[in-house]
Amino acid sequence: MDIVYQEITELAEIFNVQDRGEKLVADLRAREAAAREKIGSTDGKLSAVVWFSSTQVDADPYVAGKFGAPANILSALGIKNVIDSEEEWPTVGWETIAKSNPSMIVAAKLDRRRYPADDIAVKHQFLENDAVTKLMPAVKGKHVFDMDAQSMSTSLRVIEGIETLASDIAASDLNK
């Protein structure tokens, strides 16, 4: 979120509305803190993979690397991203993901239908039926959380991604 806060501050200076920029940043920081408070301390015990899409349902998925908005969402909540790639959206095989045993899978909800796995229902069906993914504790434990894909790009909507994920975790048994 720091990059978003910086951009807001810089734009507020350019347009000579620093007070409004400061107020917006303070509001976003408060929302971020409230989301963290909702799940309490994760003590480094939670991990995740963020699945954006796949060119084919059973192809290696595009997942969030260690840079970009999804990585920032996870970091804001103290969640480890199991994907350690410097690419923003690398493709990683499900066998590799399963070996890393993420506590949760965050699945992007997309309005587009460029690829079959853009459909969130198709993602869920795949996870529940694939020979590898259906055995993952995150899938078996129903810790597959949907997130609007717009929250996964660096913008003001990142805060919605943080809040959505915090609410999903709080409603689950993950951080108890």
Where are the regions that the model predicts?
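Alpha-helical scaffolding within the catalytic cores
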Residues: 34, 90-96, 126-133
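Short acidic/glycine-rich loop or secondary-structure boundary segments that cap or lie
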Residues: 56-61, 114-116
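Alpha-helical, coiled-coil/dimerization segments enriched in small aliphatic residues
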Residues: 60-89
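Proline-aspartate-enriched helix->loop->beta-strand connector
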Residues: 94-110
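A ligand-binding cleft/hinge motif common to bilobed small-molecule-binding domains
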Residues: 107-127
